[in-house]
Structures are given as structure tokens and as C-alpha cells.
Amino acid sequence: MENFSNSKRIKSEKLGIDLIRSRIEGYVKDLKLRHVDVDELVERIVSGWCEDMTRKETIDYCSETAASMITKHPEYGQISSRIIVSYIHEITMDSFVEKIKYIQKHRGMVSEEMYGIILEHGETIEGMINYENDFLFSYFGILTLMKSYLIKVGEEIIERPQDMFMRVALQIHKTDFEKVREVYNLLSGHYFTHATPTLYNSCLKNPQLASCFLITPREDSIEGVYHMINQAAIITKYSGGIGLNLHGIRSKGSSLRSTGGRSNGIIPLIQVLNATKRYINQGAERRPGSIAIFLEPWHMEIFDFLELRKNTGPEEFRARDIFTALWINDLFMERVKNNEEWSLFCPSQAVGLSDVWGEEFNALYCKYEKTISRTVVPAQKLWKAIIEAQIETGTPYMCYKDACNRLSNQQHLGTIKSSNLCAEIVEYSSGEETSVCNLASICLPMFVKDGWFDFEAFRRVVKILTVNLNRVIDFNYYPVEEARRSNMRNRPIGIGVQGLADLFAILRLAFESDGARSLNQDIFEAMYYSAMEASCELAEKEGPFPSYEGSPISKGIFHFELAGRKASGNWDWEGLRERIRRHGVRNSLLIALMPTAGTSQIFGNNEAFEPHASNIYTRRTHAGEFQIVNQHLVNDLVRLGLWSYEMKNLVIENEGSIQNITSIPHEIREIYKTAWEIKMKSVIDLAADRQVFVDQSQSLNIFIAKPTYSQLTSMHFYGYHCGLKTGMYYLRTRPITSAIKFTVDKKLAEKTLSSMNDTDDPCSMCSS
């Protein structure tokens, strides 16, 4: 325990300027950094130096000072990271086993099974760990890990990032050390990551590793409603994000047979869920509890539902910590398009309407319009209320009920009634089954090899993740029985991606280019094929998932065929179909493109499949406020001899855009268009192209700087007609007024811009 007895002493020790300079010079030499000015960095450190700073305070100050220069060049971020990681290594023990013992002694949080495995096989496990890989993290990534992911005792960080990765590998494969090594090496090398709850809870007591839970109330009664609230509370306690639907809960004013009273409707119920979410804290400063509530647009209280997150209005009708989402049927979209009437019903009278979809829904809905009481509104009036809510609050999400059911390998189980917290999971849930999804994402930039995307390496990793997520299903702790029952019966998984925009930049592909569109399709076809192949191989050994019979895949129908599309011919789909006919598949669902908000920060990738929001921006997280530079852009401009203090100021002055900086070659400007400059039609086209190979859905954000009714209507209908399941996760908008850019020397920027050569000579880097 020597490291821990010395930890406080190390923190309180003082570091001198000479030692700081020596260390920085060593980092620059070791990392072969060509763009770090040691004298300038040390000068900045000296300018704010305080003689009585402790070692911990000095480390924080020096790393923050280096990080403040990231906009000068991303290499300063490597210095920041090196300072922090070196310090973590100083104050933590070298032995993984000793750290686990220490955690168990002081917090008692390691599971007895995993504790026994670690103690028995400690030498084997420690021989696999490479702590040098901790230095692969960016400054931003390492701070995020320190703040929220690495295990602490009190305020003391006990483990290193590699220890966390080893916990994950051990949790998944236990004593199968060949697979433990394989998974650890890929995690350590930043090829993929498991979901945040898996990183948090692996090897701990009650290892709840799943991200997403979808709840349907058992019944419209006090007992049914509070059973749902109880489930939500317990799942939130164990780091799960929740999507639930209230389609079947009666509306305000409807009669209560048991008491003779009147229902207060869904708004007070949503406020109870809102308060529950606020009350329950998931692991202190870790993942906060979150709930998304789905409602069909025929529900009598739909207009009040749309008001829930608005900034103004009576507080008794607001629940701003809840995320709202719509579960939209085709008939509503048709009526909006044709400017027809729309009927609102109380679910206690419109019995079974949420239980059907497609033509069956249309027939029942039209029957109810003729036979039961209803409120009639113009469909476009409701549509306008939806758009107004989205412009003000960014929500509700737009999920298309009929597409989600029509294009689902779980359609044989019953009607799917909602998505999840992030609108990428589409699974069947009922009063008896709370659906679950276990997630992981692949870091796409890691598969660039000699200027090409390495599909074989990519396919190998997809197959490894498919196996991993099956083990997660098997070894997961299920906080409620309904979740265990559903996950064991249907065995859905969700493999996603991060860094698609980074991949395009590395390969010199503009987001809107034909090349990007083609690669996008090829990646997700390969991903679906590889996951399906691995799932079939597992089924050969372990049998198909228990609810396999009757599913589309049991009939030899792939997801892209449900969508009426054909595969490219790159892969042997017919051979795979024949193998599935013989053995089945182990999983009902395979691909789900989640937001990756937390893990992409750790691994230094752009989120999921999104375009870059900016080329220079401030990131705010639990760990603080950070300036992020698009390092691919900086590297390109450095090669062209264009990156300078003045250029940095120009990019800041242009709010992270380079489109008006004509000294930058046109090809480069095309590659680094931001989300605000890319046509949303192109973003939706990419989403639609990959959707045919995504058997769940995708957390698709829409970026419109100053959205209007007509713009949003156009985007929604375009995505709907393209066959998207999730038409919109969040609507991202920009502030009406820009913040004052205190760091910009505006006159110098203008002078530099006017003096630059504005000819668009071809870029040699883009011609290959």
C-alpha cells in the first residue's frame, strides 16, 4: 500500500519551475512534438505561478495552462495529458491486484466472484496490462475519466484507465483469459468501447451493465402506474436510462369506475416521474438519471404534453427534467400533409389503439372516429404545436411507429410501443417484459490503413463485440425481473459507431460527397453482415434466441429486405441466409447507433455519425470547460503552412467555420464544413442509406441554426418519406446572438483576411 501512504505526501510536495521545464522538455522530446514552444509555455506557467502551491495544485495548474494553448496547436493537449497521466501513475499503485484489494478493503464494492478470480489469477491478469496506453488519452478524455469513471476511495483516485479496461474484459469473459486479453487489447488500443454503465460497474457488486430500458405500464390503474414508477426508480438507481410510454393511460377528466371520481390525467403522473428522476442520484457525479416519455399523437392530452418542457407557463403543467417524444403513425402524417382533421381520444375509450399499427391501426382509428367521443382538431394545428415546441425546447423526439414496427425483427412479439431515452433502441415491451439493450460503439478512425478503410479489421471487431454483448446479457445484473425475462428471451444487442466525421476527414471525404455516401453504406452493410454472421455462429453453439420462431429472420428475411432494398454484393448474403436457416441467430437485434456523448469524449472522437458542430468550440462537462480544436483541420493547415495565431483568430471570429476564409483551398473547406453548413438533406440521406442495415434505429440530430416552421416541416417529411425510424432525436439550434469573442484580435483578423491570397488553387492532398 506504499503508493497510498505516500499519496497525500506526494500531493502536498512542491514542484519547482526548473523541474516543470525539465519534464515538459522531456515530453516534447519523447513525443517528437514539433509545434510546442517550450519557452512560451513555461513563460505562461511562470506568469501565474504561486510559490506555496502543492504538487497537486501545480499539476492541475500546469496541465490547464498547456490545455489553454490547444487552439494554438493540438500538440499542447498532448502535453496536458502527459502531465495528468504521469501524476495519476505517481499516486496510484502499479499492481492491479493490490488496487482491487484496496478498493475492497475500503469500499467493499467488488463482487465476491470477480474478487476471487482476480486474486487467484492475479499474475496472469497483470501480465496483460500495458499502463503505457494510458498516455493515448487526450487531456479532455483523461479528465472525463478522472471525474466520472475511475474508482475512488473518498476523493482519492485509486485506479488507472487500464485498470478500468481490465475490469470490463474480466467481467465479460471471466476466466477465459485468451478472450480477456483480446478484449483488453482492443479497449486499450481505442478500437471500441463498451457503454458507460459497463465501464462504471464491471466487476462490482450488482454489475448492471446495460444502458437502455423500455417500460410499458402493466395497466391503467393505481397499481399499474406505481409499478411502472417503481421500476423506473430502481432502474435509474442502477445507471439505466429509461424510455416509457403512456399511450394507454387515461386522460384528464375521464371517469374512474372504482371510485366514481375523475382522472387527473398524465401530466401529474409525468411530474411524479420528473420528481423521481431528480430524487435518485446515479452514482454521485456519474450518469444522472434520465427518462424519455413517449406519447401517440391521438392522446387527448397531447397539447399539454407538448408544453411540458417550455420555459414559460404554469409550473403545475411543466416537467422540464423529462424528455418528451412522439410515437407517430402514418395516418397522422398523411392527415397533416392533406390538411385534414385529426381526432383525439381518451385511451380508456379508444381501447387497443396503441396495440396495433399499420392498416390495423388505421381501421381501428377510423372506426373510433365514428363510434366514440372525441375531440377534433385540424391535423396541422397539432403539427404546428409540435414544431413550436421543438423550436423552443429541442424536443419532442420524432419516432415513426409504423416504420419501427414494419422494419423490426421483433414484430412477431407484438406492437412496439416506444423507443428509449436516446431514440435509437426499438424493442418490444409490455407489462410483463421491460426491454433492455446492451451497447458498445466502434471507433471508426482506428480502421484507416494506408489511406483506406480496413474492412477486414473492422469486421473482426464487430464480431468480437457481438460475442462480448452476448456475454453481457448472460452476466448482467437485472434490477427488475421484467428486464431479465425480456433480455433472456429476446437477446437484443446494439452495436454503434463513433467518429464517422473524423473518418471522412482522415480519408479526405467531404460529408456531402458521393465518396462519403458510398463509404457510409459500405460500412453499415459490413457491420450488419458481420454481426449477423457472429450471431449465427453463436447460435450454432448455444442455440437461437428463445423467441426466434416466427421472427422475420427465422423466415430468412434480412432487415434490408424488410425495407425493400438489396445488398451490394460485397458479402455472401445467400450463404449466410443458408447458415441461418440451419442454425438460427443468437440475437433478435444487432445494430443501434447511439449518441456516444460520454465515450466519444473519452476517446477523442466526434460523436457517433454526426458532422462536426464546429472546428473550434468550448466543451462543457462535469470536468470543466475546455476548448476543442478540430485536430484534423489543424494538421491539414499546418501542412499547407496556413496555421498561425492569425488563422486561429479568423476561425474563432467565424464561430468555428472556415467557409469565408478563402486563403484555405476549396477542397479543404468542403471537408471541414460544420453541421450548420451541411445541407440537412445530405445528413438525412446518409441516415436513410444506413438505416436499411440498422435493425434498430439511430439517434439522429437535426441541425438548423434558426429553424422556421417550413424548414422543420420539410425536414420531418423528407426523413419520414426516406423511411427513417427516428426522424429526429434533438433539434439543435444556435443562439440568436453570438457570445463576445474576448480571445480574438478582430482588427488583426480582418487585416490578415484582407491580405491573404483568395485564389482557390487545387489542394494536392485532395487530389489522390
Swiss-Prot record:
Q: Name one Pfam family in it.
A: Ribonuc_red_lgN
Question: What are the UniProt keywords, alphabetically?
Answer: Allosteric enzyme, ATP-binding, Deoxyribonucleotide synthesis, Disulfide bond, Nucleotide-binding, Oxidoreductase
Q: Which CDD domains match?
A: RNR_I (cd01679)
Active site residues per record: N420, C422, E424
Q: Which GO terms describe its biological process?
A: deoxyribonucleotide biosynthetic process
The GO cellular component terms are: ribonucleoside-diphosphate reductase complex
**Which residues does dTTP bind?**
D220, S221, I222, K237, R250
Q: Where is this site: Important for hydrogen atom transfer?
A: C212, C437
- Which cysteines share a disulfide bond? C212-C437
EC number from the UniProt entry: 1.17.4.1
- Name the residues that bind ATP: S7, K8, E13, K14, L15, G16, I17, D18, L19
Chain residues that bind GDP: T196, S211, N420, E424
* InterPro entries recorded: NrdE_NrdA_C (IPR013346), RNR_lg_C (IPR000788), RNR_lsu_N (IPR013509), RNR_R1-su_N (IPR008926), Rrm1 (IPR039718)
Site annotated as Important for electron transfer: where? Y729, Y730
Instruction: Output one GO MF annotation.
Output: ATP binding
The protein's site described by Interacts with thioredoxin/glutaredoxin is found at C763, C766
What this protein catalyses is: a 2'-deoxyribonucleoside 5'-diphosphate + [thioredoxin]-disulfide + H2O = a ribonucleoside 5'-diphosphate + [thioredoxin]-dithiol
Query: What does the UniProt record note about how this protein's activity is regulated?
Result: Under complex allosteric control mediated by deoxynucleoside triphosphates and ATP binding to separate specificity and activation sites on the large subunit. The type of nucleotide bound at the specificity site determines substrate preference. It seems probable that ATP makes the enzyme reduce CDP and UDP, dGTP favors ADP reduction and dTTP favors GDP reduction. Stimulated by ATP and inhibited by dATP binding to the activity site.
Subunit record text: Heterodimer of a large and a small subunit.
The protein's job, in short, is:
Provides the precursors necessary for DNA synthesis. Catalyzes the biosynthesis of deoxyribonucleotides from the corresponding ribonucleotides.
Describe the family membership recorded for this protein in Swiss-Prot or TrEMBL. Belongs to the ribonucleoside diphosphate reductase large chain family.
**What is the protein name stated in its UniProt record?**
Ribonucleoside-diphosphate reductase large chain
Q: Which organism is it from?
A: Encephalitozoon cuniculi (strain GB-M1) (Microsporidian parasite)
